[in-house]
Structure formats: structure tokens, C-alpha cells
């Protein structure tokens, strides 16, 4: 691998001159610059990112720690983060944790060794062990996005999931549905719990009974939607509509309904949550609750850049208000 000394020798100049050409830190005669650039091209020389970072105290890179980059909702946020980084001339190191505290610790240590300029942590929930661990890593700018209760270590995402759960359920009620089931997430998790509470409020306001046989709990995966829907379909009486608390569980539910020879929305209406990109291509296209993944990703990165440039540590609140997206998976029963 070629070094700066090799470039200097081929061009017949000093290593200092080569450095000035690369970094544009001083005027260099056009003919000399041409010789240096030709040598760089012929030798396929690439400056050491680590060496440059030690000089200018920046690597133009950030780390991002997420629970899982496979989940469509997080994947769309990650895409927005990467695009925003690219436009700012930054590279992104992506680390998956599966909510494993040891992996979070190892990833944080690795990113610090790589001298990233800042770290973005975006998980759906945090254990106390994770929060205590993050509190110890204050040596560089850190933005911790948290959907959970107020915590002194974290920024806060107020996604108004209660409002979204209420909005989804009320839409079903307003279209004449009275027998409504729900496939919720894990109800020990803040996001799942608040969406479920929004469902309860809408049902209670309308004076509708909640059938416990139609209340299911999953883990926000398509398999959970499929299995939970099959349990509902095994009951003696069926709901006319089901609120799935994310779009991928809705996909599993639609698959289970089809396998039983029933149709969406003619026999059972389905409404989802998140408005992931694929939801418009479901069969039928999914009526769902929208949350802006691109705005969240851009806002999180902007906040991190502010901390990098201004050394600000003030906690931030990012608000996301849910919106109804009407497609073709809900039938009117009026």
C-alpha cells in the first residue's frame, strides 16, 4: 500500500507539499499540484482517515445503535438518517443490539475507538441497565432517542401513540364497526401499551364492549399477526374489524384471514399502524396510522450535529403526531 512518502518521491516534492495538495491548506503551484495528483492516481494512494482525524479532530463519521435494522419501521428511519448524513458529508456506522446490554456496551466501545464524531442511539425501549450504561459514555456527543417514560439520560420521542390508537379505533367505529378486536404489541412496552389504551378509550366512549377473546398480544412481527389472527378466527364469534398495532402484524393477520377462505375487508376489516412503505402494496392496500420516519430520522441527526458543533447537552423533545391514511382494507358497515 502506497504511503505519502511514495507519492512525494514520485512527484519529486516533500511530504509537506503533498499534504498541502491533499488538504488544500496552502497555495501550491499548478504544475507541482499536477505532479502530485498524477502520483496519487498512479500509486492509487488514499490518505489515512485515522491520521487525518488526529490532525483535524474529526472523522466525519457517526455511529448509530439500533435494536434491529430488519424491522421495516426502523429500517426507514435508518435510511433517512443515512441520507441526511450523506448530504452533510458524513459516513454512518450501523450497529444492531437486539436489546442485549453487553452488545450495546461493546458497540459503544468500538465506536469510540473508531473516533466517530457522535453516536445516535435509537431503540424502542431501554432497560435500566442500558440507561445506566449510556450515562457512563459522556466523552462524545450522544443523542439517545427514547419512547419510554421521562428519564434524565435520554431525549424524548413523544409519538402520541395513545392518540394514534384512539384514531385507528374511532375510524373503525365511525364506519359502523361494533365488534372490534385488537392485535397489540407486548403490553409491558410503552408504545404497545399506549396504543392499546387509545383503543380502550375509543371503545369506552362509543359504549362498545371489549371481547377479551379478541384481544391478542404479539411482538410486532408478521408471525405474531398471523398466529394471533388465527386464535381470533378460532373463536365461535368473529369481530368485523381488527386493529393491528403495527403494519407487519397486519400483514400476518391478512394472510391468516385469506387462508381461512375469508376476505379483507369484505368479511373482516383490518387497520394497521406506522404506514411503512410496503403497506400501500398489501392486498388490499392497508388503511393505517402514519408516523413520519423521514422527519424523525432527519431531526435526530440534526440534533446530533448540533451537539457535535455546539457541544450542547440539553435534552430535546421530538414530537410526532399520528395521521390517518385511508386505503382499502376497511369496509363501511353503516
Curated annotation (Swiss-Prot):
PROSITE patterns: HTH_LACI_1, HTH_LACI_2. Gene3D superfamilies: 3.40.50.2300, lambda repressor-like DNA-binding domains. Residues 2-56 form the HTH lacI-type domain. One of its GO terms (molecular function) is DNA-binding transcription factor activity. Pathway: Purine metabolism; purine nucleotide biosynthesis [regulation]. Keywords: DNA-binding, Purine biosynthesis, Repressor, Transcription, Transcription regulation. Pfam families: LacI (PF00356), Peripla_BP_3 (PF13377). Is the main repressor of the genes involved in the de novo synthesis of purine nucleotides, regulating purB, purC, purEK, purF, purHD, purL, purMN and guaBA expression. PurR is allosterically activated to bind its cognate DNA by binding the purine corepressors, hypoxanthine or guanine, thereby effecting transcription repression. Homodimer. This is HTH-type transcriptional repressor PurR. It comes from Pasteurella multocida (strain Pm70). The gene is purR.
Amino acid at each position: 500500500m502506497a504511503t505519502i512518502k511514495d507519492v512525494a518521491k514520485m512527484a519529486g516534492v516533500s511530504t509537506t507539499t503533498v499534504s498541502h495538495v491533499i488538504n488544500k491548506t496552502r497555495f501550491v503551484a499548478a504544475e507541482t499540484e499536477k505532479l502530485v495528483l498524477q502520483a496519487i492516481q498512479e500509486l492509487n494512494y488514499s490518505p489515512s482517515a485515522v491520521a487525518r482525524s488526529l490532525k483535524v479532530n474529526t472523522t466525519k463519521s457517526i455511529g448509530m445503535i439500533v435494536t434491529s435494522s430488519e424491522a421495516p419501521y426502523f429500517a426507514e428511519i435508518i435510511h433517512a438518517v443515512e441520507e441526511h448524513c450523506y448530504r452533510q458529508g458524513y459516513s454512518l456506522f450501523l450497529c444492531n443490539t437486539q436489546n442485549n446490554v453487553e452488545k450495546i456496551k461493546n458497540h459503544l466501545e468500538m465506536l469510540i475507538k473508531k473516533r466517530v464524531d457522535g453516536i445516535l442511539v435509537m431503540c424502542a425501549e431501554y432497560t435500566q441497565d442500558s440507561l445506566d450504561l449510556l450515562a457512563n459514555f459522556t466523552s462524545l456527543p450522544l443523542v439517545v432517542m427514547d419512547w419510554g417514560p421521562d428519564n434524565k439520560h435520554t431525549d424524548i420521542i413523544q409519538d402520541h401513540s395513545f392518540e394514534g390508537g384512539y384514531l385507528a379505533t374511532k375510524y373503525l367505529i365511525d364506519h359502523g364497526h361494533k365488534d372490534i378486536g385488537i392485535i397489540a404489541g407486548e403490553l409491558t412496552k410503552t408504545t404497545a401499551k399506549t396504543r392499546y389504551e387509545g383503543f380502550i378509550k375509543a371503545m369506552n366512549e362509543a359504549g362498545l364492549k371489549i371481547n377479551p377473546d379478541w384481544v391478542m398480544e404479539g411482538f410486532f412481527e408478521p408471525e405474531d399477526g398471523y398466529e394471533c389472527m388465527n386464535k381470533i378466527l378460532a373463536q365461535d364469534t368473529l369481530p368485523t374489524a381488527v386493529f393491528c398495532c403495527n403494519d407487519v402484524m397486519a400483514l400476518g393477520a391478512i394472510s391468516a384471514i385469506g387462508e381461512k377462505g375469508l376476505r379483507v375487508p369484505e368479511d373482516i376489516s383490518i387497520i394497521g399502524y406506522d404506514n411503512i412503505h410496503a403497506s400501500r402494496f398489501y392486498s388490499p392496500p392497508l388503511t393505517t396510522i402514519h408516523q413520519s420516519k423521514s422527519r424523525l430520522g432527519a431531526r435526530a441527526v440534526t440534533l446530533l450535529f448540533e451537539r457535535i458543533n455546539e457541544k450542547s447537552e440539553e435534552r430535546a423533545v421530538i414530537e410526532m403526531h399520528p395521521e390517518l391514511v385511508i386505503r382499502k382494507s376497511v369496509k363501511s358497515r353503516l
